[in-house]
Amino acid sequence: MREEILEIFLLVNFVFILCTSIMVRIRYVSCKTNFDCVNLKCPTPFVTPKCVSGGCECPLKELLTLLSDTNYGVAACIDYCKAKGENAYTCILNHCYCRKPSM
């Protein structure tokens, strides 16, 4: 009986250690809102992490980037700069110029 309890304890311990290391490796961050995911860095600077099912994720659908030389209009320029964490400065001759927000 003691051996079975010891085996169960070791198994639970092993699963806990394994799951913890996996969560650290993929940088799992629990969340309730998108604001909780601000500190998570996504692979590309144009993607903002989102809270999905209680965990922060970098949405793969948004891994497409908008080039600075674009003809998509002012709204796309503003969204592009916002995705970079910057403010739209101006959109002239199909070029989108962003600037860092003032502190």
UniProtKB/Swiss-Prot annotation:
Lineage, broadest ranks: Eukaryota, Viridiplantae, Streptophyta, Embryophyta, Tracheophyta
Biological-process GO terms, alphabetical: defense response to fungus; killing of cells of another organism
Q: Which family does it belong to?
A: Belongs to the DEFL family.
* One GO term describing the cellular component: extracellular region
SS bonds (residue pairs) = 31-51, 37-56, 42-58
**Per its record, how is this protein called by name?**
Putative defensin-like protein 305
Domain of life of the native organism = Eukaryota
Q: Which UniProt keywords apply?
A: Antimicrobial, Disulfide bond, Fungicide, Plant defense, Secreted, Signal
